[in-house]
């Protein structure tokens, strides 16, 4: 690897090399031991998006506990979140939207990024069927929030082929696997079930473009959770959790005849496990959340992210938080600045 010689012969020079992680996923690249530091990169968070678009004060409010922020300000931030749902966090997309104010131009950049991914897929035809890889990529984007099965990801190919495509996309960090687990203790990964899983995409903007979400129609929705059947909201939460809190995501699911239950996410804060639901509001059904809190007494409280302002119920077991508050609900990752 030629870059090693910069480290050895010119260590004062700062070098950044960019490229597709698919090459790493296929094992095409060798890394010189002891000469590479790894830093996990993510799309820009909602906080970073607000900073980039000149809304510094609003950005700082998103990192504050919502009880310390006036309800009217929370509502303004939620309105701004609508734009982020469609612009997403890819830096070039954010820059285009900031400079032009045009969603159309932003969507064009998103399409170019997706085309570049597909061009990357075609380079690795001997390793994996390109059509299968692209079909699984699209299937995951359309299935955010749903439990997945390899056999259903792409009807035209075998479960084994679909799994290979899914695993390669996950290794390249274009998608992220979210297994179910038993929240009876830490670490959550100790009880992860690799056969029961959901998935999220790299970026919410790319996800909506890939799914061809009808933007004009969805922007008329007053409730963020109603946009694209709630899939945009769940993708947003997954994306923010990965950036702020953890390199792994988990959820809880119970399959019982006539009494199935599922809680969208599990987060860890100060050594305690908190179930997290992404719901339309206090009036929505929270049966699964109540069932989990009853079954797992070690969970001190349930958190509900919704399209409204902060609200804590009298029994103290449920707290309703504005959807943008994902950055405040779990332990912050050490490398988040």
Language-model segments: residues:
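A short acidic, amphipathic alpha-helical/loop segment
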Residues: 1-5, 165, 288-292
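Short, polar loop motifs at secondary-structure junctions
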Residues: 20-24, 304-311
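Domain-level recognition of nuclease-like catalytic cores that cleave nucleotide substrates
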Residues: 309-337
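Accessory nucleic acid-recognition modules appended to NTPase machines
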Residues: 95-270
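Active-site-adjacent loop/helix micro-motif of nuclease/hydrolase catalytic cores
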Residues: 281-291, 313
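Active-site ExK catalytic segment of metal-dependent nucleases
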Residues: 273-283
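Interdomain motor-coupling "hinge/lid" segment immediately C-terminal to the ATP-binding subdomain
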Residues: 19-20, 26-143
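Conserved catalytic/switch belt of AAA+ P-loop NTPases
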Residues: 1-22
């Amino acid at each position: 690897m030629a870059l090693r010689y910069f480290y050895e012969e010119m260590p004062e020079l700062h070098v950044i090399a960019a490229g597709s992680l698919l090459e790493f996923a296929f094992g095409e690249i060798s890394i010189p031991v002891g000469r590479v530091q790894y830093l996990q990169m993510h799309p820009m968070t909602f906080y970073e998006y607000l900073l980039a678009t000149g809304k510094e004060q609003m950005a700082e409010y998103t990192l504050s506990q919502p009880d310390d922020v006036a309800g009217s300000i929370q509502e303004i931030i939620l309105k701004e979140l609508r734009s982020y749902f469609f612009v997403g966090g890819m830096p070039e997309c954010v820059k285009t939207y900031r400079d032009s104010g045009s969603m159309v131009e932003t969507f064009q950049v998103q399409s170019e990024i997706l085309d570049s991914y597909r061009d990357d897929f075609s380079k690795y035809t001997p390793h994996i069927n390109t059509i299968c890889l692209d079909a699984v990529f699209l299937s995951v984007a359309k299935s955010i929030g749903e439990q997945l099965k390899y056999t259903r990801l792409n009807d035209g190919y075998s479960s084994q082929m679909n799994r290979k495509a899914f695993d390669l996309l996950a290794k390249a960090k274009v998608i992220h696997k979210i297994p179910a687990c038993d929240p009876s203790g830490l670490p959550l990964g100790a009880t992860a079930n690799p056969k029961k899983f959901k998935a999220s995409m790299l970026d919410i903007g790319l996800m909506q473009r890939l799914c061809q979400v009808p933007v004009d129609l969805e922007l008329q929705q007053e409730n963020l959770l109603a946009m694209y059947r709630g899939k945009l909201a769940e993708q947003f939460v997954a994306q923010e959790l990965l950036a702020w809190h953890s390199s792994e995501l988990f959820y809880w699911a119970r399959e019982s005849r006539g009494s199935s239950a599922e809680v969208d996410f599990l987060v860890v804060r100060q050594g305690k496990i908190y179930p997290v639901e992404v719901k339309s509001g206090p009036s929505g059904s929270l049966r699964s959340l109540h069932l989990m809190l009853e079954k797992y007494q070690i969970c001190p409280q349930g958190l509900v992210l919704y399209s409204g302002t902060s609200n804590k119920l009298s029994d103290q077991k449920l707290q309703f938080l504005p959807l943008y508050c994902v950055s405040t609900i779990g332990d912050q990752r050490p490398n988040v600045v």
